[in-house]
Amino acid sequence: MQTYLVGGAVRDQLLNLPVKDRDWVVVGATPEQLLSLGYQQVGRDFPVFLHPKTKEEYALARTERKSGAGYTGFICDFSPHISLEQDLIRRDLTINAIAQDNQGKFIDPYEGISDLKNRTLRHISPAFAEDPLRVLRVARFAARYHQLDFSIAPETIALMAEITEKGELQQLTIERVWQETEKALKEKNPEIYFQVLLQVGALKILFPELYALYGVPNPAQYHPEIDSFLHTMLVLQQAVRLTENTEFNKSAVRFAAICHDLGKALTPKDILPHHYGHEKAGIQPIRTLSNRLKVPTYYKELAEFTCEYHSYIHKAFELKPETVIKLFNKLDVWRKPQRFEELMLVCVADTRGRTGFEQTAYPQKDYLRQLYQTALQVNVQQVIEDGFEKQGIRDELTRRRTIAVKTKKAEILPRFVGQ
């Protein structure tokens, strides 16, 4: 019985990146042997065990043979005679098929180390096509390692496109699609994930609402990048920069960024490149996308609010105090202050997600935050003590908050408009 460190731990070690989880493969053993050594079996479809002390995962070396559609139709053989090389070849990419023995020696039968040096994501064998989820996984790896100048091998791109064309992606469960997408949103370059999916034809199938933005023009005066899909990817880039090293819900903000302009795909062709009313028009595509992929409610709500109100927020200096309070009420910022801050981040990203506007200031954020903080100072308890009841409490709160915002606006607006 021999154990080898495999997968991401070896790959990231060779890239001088922090190693998060360590996975092991066991060659020449049976489930009974591992159980007798105190390992705990957790794998349902094939034997995976937890080490009695470290709780790290140890899997018996196995081969997989395609037996049906999708990514679950496999027959596994995990008998003791399966070699390390046989186990490694079933993996997706060469860079994920490097093993390390107990002496620190690397076993690299499929030239993964060479591909790491050349910054190439390359599939190991034609068996890659047997698991359509790998199309999304490779797109996600491209997003993760883009900062290290990795690119996908042309033959792997071609195979991903072939898998897509054959309709294999339709076999994926929505849970797995969202799981891969949410992971991609947490990477440093999530826009690469969507661009790769576009390149191989998968975006149209999995994210038709986002794909519909491709080729839809914007006025060049405000959007030198012109294309609505490209603008959305630039906004996503900016959202990443704005949410790094913050306590905000990064994935929710980034999801809102990719959804904020979905309504532009529905703009009547005769009024292009203008997009009057795209804010309201975008609500339904967001709901359709979110419901189909079972996106978390918090993400969906933030995306909808961003879509509907981002243009209002861009014009914050023109809003009447009554409109500002109405906006705050709709966002329920009194109970959800984080939502206010996250919405502001997407609006900043929207402004900067345009070619040549990457460093643009966004004073609307500080202006609205000051109005918000002023409105927060209106004391609910005082309203109740003044004798108001039920609906009267809410009406009086709105009245007092509006007065407070009106006073604050008169005080600070000249300073902001003069910037």
UniProtKB/Swiss-Prot annotation:
ATP binds at residues 8, 11, 91, 137, 140. Magnesium is required for nucleotidyltransferase activity. InterPro entries: CCA_bact (IPR012006), HD/PDEase_dom (IPR003607), HD_domain (IPR006674), NT_sf (IPR043519), PolA_pol_head_dom (IPR002646), PolyA_RNA-bd (IPR032828), tRNA_CCA-adding_enzyme (IPR050124). It catalyses: a tRNA precursor + 2 CTP + ATP = a tRNA with a 3' CCA end + 3 diphosphate; a tRNA with a 3' CCA end + 2 CTP + ATP = a tRNA with a 3' CCACCA end + 3 diphosphate. The keyword Flavoprotein does not apply. PROSITE patterns: HD. SUPFAM superfamilies: Nucleotidyltransferase, Poly A polymerase C-terminal region-like. Its cofactor is Mg(2+); Ni(2+). CTP binds at residues 8, 11, 91, 137, 140. GO terms for molecular function: ATP binding; CCA tRNA nucleotidyltransferase activity; cyclic-nucleotide phosphodiesterase activity; magnesium ion binding; phosphatase activity; tRNA binding. Its EC number is 2.7.7.72, 3.1.3.-, 3.1.4.-. It comes from the Bacteria. CDD domains: HDc, NT_ClassII-CCAase. Monomer. Can also form homodimers and oligomers. Catalyzes the addition and repair of the essential 3'-terminal CCA sequence in tRNAs without using a nucleic acid template. Adds these three nucleotides in the order of C, C, and A to the tRNA nucleotide-73, using CTP and ATP as substrates and producing inorganic pyrophosphate. tRNA 3'-terminal CCA addition is required both for tRNA processing and repair. Also involved in tRNA surveillance by mediating tandem CCA addition to generate a CCACCA at the 3' terminus of unstable tRNAs. While stable tRNAs receive only 3'-terminal CCA, unstable tRNAs are marked with CCACCA and rapidly degraded. Comprises two domains: an N-terminal domain containing the nucleotidyltransferase activity and a C-terminal HD domain associated with both phosphodiesterase and phosphatase activities. This is Multifunctional CCA protein. It comes from Mannheimia succiniciproducens (strain KCTC 0769BP / MBEL55E). The lineage of its organism: Bacteria, Pseudomonadati, Pseudomonadota, Gammaproteobacteria, Pasteurellales.
